[in-house]
Amino acid sequence: MTSKTIRIMIVDDDQDLAESLADLLQAHGYDVAVAKDGQDALEHARGEDFDMTLMDVRMPVMNGVDSFLAIRKIKPQARIVMMTGFKEPILERAISAGAEGPLHKPFSLDDLLKLFETIH
């Protein structure tokens, strides 16, 4: 029996953070894609399937909440966890529409690995 590799998309305009996080997760056996903003995430979601997406809230071009709502229109079952380092009033729009989280920055690798254990 083969086990499926878990696919994660990290969406954050802080590319150093996103790439570091991707490297850590890849070292733990996850297949990781990185998107630089909400619009880039939407393009990834149109062409690929992910088991979970970690989405920053504050980003240029398209913020995380708008990206979440757009992705949910094309992939209603998408699991998207909102990440933020701030108290975000707009976050409630995403949470009430089914987003998971928020995952508050800074978070630990252990926090993420526990979150990923919920992926079936």
Predicted features and spans:
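Two-component/phosphorelay signaling modules centered on CheY-like receiver
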Residues: Q15-A33
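Acidic catalytic/metal-coordinating carboxylates
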Residues: K36-D40, N63-D66
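Receiver (REC) domain active-site loop signature in two-component systems and cognate sites
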Residues: M59
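Non-catalytic signal-transmission and effector/linker regions of two-component phosphorelay proteins
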Residues: M1-R7, D110-H120
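Alpha4 helix (beta4-alpha4-beta5 surface) of REC/receiver domains from two-component response regulators
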Residues: D66, F86-L103, K114
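Active-site residues of response regulator receiver
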Residues: D56
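Short amphipathic alpha-helix used as the core "switch/output" element in two-component signaling
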Residues: E43, V65-Q77
